[in-house]
Amino acid sequence: LSAITPPSFKWSFLGPKYWLTWIGVFVLYAITWLPLPLIRRIGAGTGRLVGLIVPKRVKVAKRNIALTYPELEVSRVDALTRENLRRAGMALFETAMGWWWPGWRIRRCFEIEGYEHVEAAMAQGKGVFGLALHNMNLEFACRGLGYTHPAIAFYRKHNNPLVDYLQYHGRARSNKYMIHKRNAKALISALDSQELCLYLPDQDYGRSQSIFVPFGGVKETATSTATLMFARRANCIPMIFTSQYTTKGYKVKIYPPMPELAEMETRAALTHLNTQVATIVAEQPESYLWMHKRFKTRPNDTDASLYD
């Protein structure tokens, strides 16, 4: 089967090995019942605490922002880093909200912009290859999107079996099913069947799976070629999806189709895609996942790290 077999609850989850996990789960669950403005305030405070606990991640975020936007003054980079840290703290609670909030509460603070692009693709008999940008609130956004159009996505198993159980079933609440992260054929099959499939094109997957094209101010950024493989082999139309904050709550924004990706030469296509991604990230740069080393992989082993 292409879909991952849902993990089952095990009585061993009640043993001492998982007690600390359960404490964290109960605290998160309790906080999710608070009003959203209060949850956001708690999240911001948590983000500041995270900055004290893992200062290396703060340093990585600051470096990524400075590399991507070399035109920014140091004060602006510092301000964006602080806000990104607050959003990182909020992401912990947004994940819990995405897993456990009742549907009525999600619908009340969630909206979708650009869904007509999905409808148009489906009317043409095409699948939708949703290129989802790795924003902090992605977990919550996927849950909200599922109430309008259930999606399919790759799944990476969590190392903690209890968290994996909660994570899988939380993500599956409003979506169709999930595919093992290495099962490319299953994703292509789903796209050929006119499904909406979500894929993260903006991560560093290593030198062997990438070519180096510009992203913002970094002229040689490892960019996955798998994105084009799916766009070319499947009966689909690619389009970018992003999740954004609003005064009301959250929004998934869907951008115009990019059928040209499948026709362009590989380097030109990925350069074009990265240009679009960087432009969209700049709409709410404080929400992007800057804390991972996006520019870790360099073209050659002898190249100096951008993080030293």
What is each of the regions a protein language model found here?
Residues 2-5, 53, 76-82, 122, ...:
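Non-catalytic C-terminal accessory region of glycerolipid acyltransferases
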Residues 95-96, 134-138, 280-283:
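Juxtamembrane/interfacial segments around transmembrane helices
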Residues 103-109, 115, 135, 159, ...:
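Generic secondary-structure boundary/loop-capping signal
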Residues 124-182, 207-211, 219-220:
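Catalytic core of membrane glycerolipid acyltransferases/transacylases, capturing the structured
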Residues 2-132, 166-175:
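Membrane-anchoring hydrophobic helices of lipid-metabolizing enzymes
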Residues 46-48, 103, 151-153, 172, ...:
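A short, structure-level motif marking secondary-structure boundaries and short turns
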Residues 26, 60, 116, 140, ...:
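Short Gly/charged-rich anion-binding patches and loops
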